[in-house]
Amino acid sequence: MRIEPIIQGVVARSAHPFGCEAAIKKQIAFVKKAPQISQGPKRVLILGASSGFGLAARIALTFGGAQADTIGVSFERGPSEKGTGSAGWYNNVFFKREAEKEGRIAINIVGDAFASETRTQVIEAIETYFEGEVDLVIYSLATGMRPIPNQPGEFWRSVIKPFGQTVTGASLDLEHDRWIDTTLESATEEEALHTIKVMGGEDWESWIDTLINAESIAQGCQTIAFSYVGPEITHPIYLDGTLGRAKIDLHQTSHSLNLKLANFDGAAYATVCKALVTKASVFIPALSPYLLALYRVMKDEKCHEGCIEQMQRLFATKLYGQDHISVDGERLVRMDDWELAPHIQNKVNQILEEMDANNFQVIGDYQGFKNEFLQLNGFGFDEVDYSQDIDLQTILKLTP
């Protein structure tokens, strides 16, 4: 069978196994040539390891100088007679293959990170492969819902809405290359609460508590989770909306976890990353035009970073091998420093003032935006022959 990209709106319905392999190899090649991570962690647990920042962190820590062994948790779908499976499934497969070639331990646990059974599996894997302790825990779950404990079949569901106001902005339909004006109504208090439950810090803290209780935290263990703040132009839909409330909760959680890990001479940080095309970010209405302008400007200025560049720089220049960890006044590690530089934002704002449905593909980096989205799912790589038929039985044997 031939695997073609299938996009519905902003959702990819297909993934190319060997395109995903190409993506993994490309990221590995980058981190091997980049400034290396020194004094890095050796035993790392990544919650949400199969795409985006979680996957990039895993690649950076394994191949970018630290030579870390990793346990990755993700909720992915394998190939079947009905479909190709998810990109994350193949990312897990090919990451493990490449890591093991270099003698690294790479354990994939495919399961619901919210489920108690998954936690039990993780603790057992730490005992078996890591001599019972971890040096770094990365929390990078991106999901729209979370099961309510002790209420089978009931979920908290996050929403992406402004708070206290109606916001009008544009979304991009990647399927038809269209600009769609959208209006978002204000969230209710209940919607905001649900979003905090799904995307805030409660589950992160619960995981760390589980690891502490299992005596799985090594001396000096750190934990990080990823956040976004953005410039003022994005605040109505992001920082001042339901997502922002959840991220503020995440930031506050980092402080309480920092106190808990102080008992192990460790620390906890929320890491503010730059705006990027990820499976999650393309869902945020009104953020896409900003991304088009930002990509254009940062590429022109030769300071554009994707997930892998961000993660390698984070571990090589901010979190490890430094006399002290540089944080802002709120104890946040800022990886959005290049994005928020005044000269970058001034140029972004100039483009946004002119951008509309007629010219967004010309004055913004729409081609780069869409290609990055396709590459998340294994498409758009020059080195892959997409005309080649793929035998279903071959990919059914690819297990993480």
From Swiss-Prot:
Binding of NAD(+), residues: 48-53, 75-76, 112-113, 141-142, 247, 276-278
Active site: 238 (proton donor)
Any GO molecular function: trans-2-enoyl-CoA reductase (NADH) activity
Residues reported in the UniProt entry to bind substrate: 228
Site residues by UniProt (Plays an important role in discriminating NADH against NADPH): 76
Metabolic or biological pathway, per its Swiss-Prot or TrEMBL entry: Lipid metabolism; fatty acid biosynthesis
GO biological process: fatty acid biosynthetic process
Subunit structure as annotated in this protein's UniProt entry: Monomer.
Function noted in UniProt: Involved in the final reduction of the elongation cycle of fatty acid synthesis (FAS II). Catalyzes the reduction of a carbon-carbon double bond in an enoyl moiety that is covalently linked to an acyl carrier protein (ACP).
Family: Belongs to the TER reductase family.
Protein name: Enoyl-[acyl-carrier-protein] reductase [NADH] 2
Organism of derivation: Vibrio vulnificus (strain YJ016)
Organism taxonomic ancestry: Bacteria, Pseudomonadati, Pseudomonadota, Gammaproteobacteria, Vibrionales
Gene label: fabV2
